């Protein structure tokens, strides 16, 4: 069994009725992983991947033997001398994130911390606004926090394009789901 990933490494669970490979995990490093070859008697076997919510199965193919693919499962009939290789490819689910900073009554630089692909960043308003570029992020839970800036008060924080953001002062926790276009707007006066 070969496991390939696009967009990041992960751990993937498989089930089968193949002796020596009943329930197993493959963890990709450099976007690939594989089991060792396992000798099996002739017969029919099943193999299936338990697809994590953060990935989509984007490819499944087998070579050797007789296989019937019904994604994410495979029925494999192994004959004498067959060498069967099944390759599963998963692509990391992503969303996009944009942070907008609006100011009323002037311009300033505002610092943010985040555990997103943006990392820690600063936005300096010009004409009362500034934003990050739309950034692709893997699906998951993230925090974005605006650090208090002297002379400015946070008067509004709203995130759209995501379900149930949690606000706590200048911090928002978002749950980025597949294909969401999340926009968080911080307004200071």
Each model region followed by its residue ranges:
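Solvent-exposed loop/turn and edge beta-strand elements of beta-rich ligand-binding domains
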Residues: 1-189
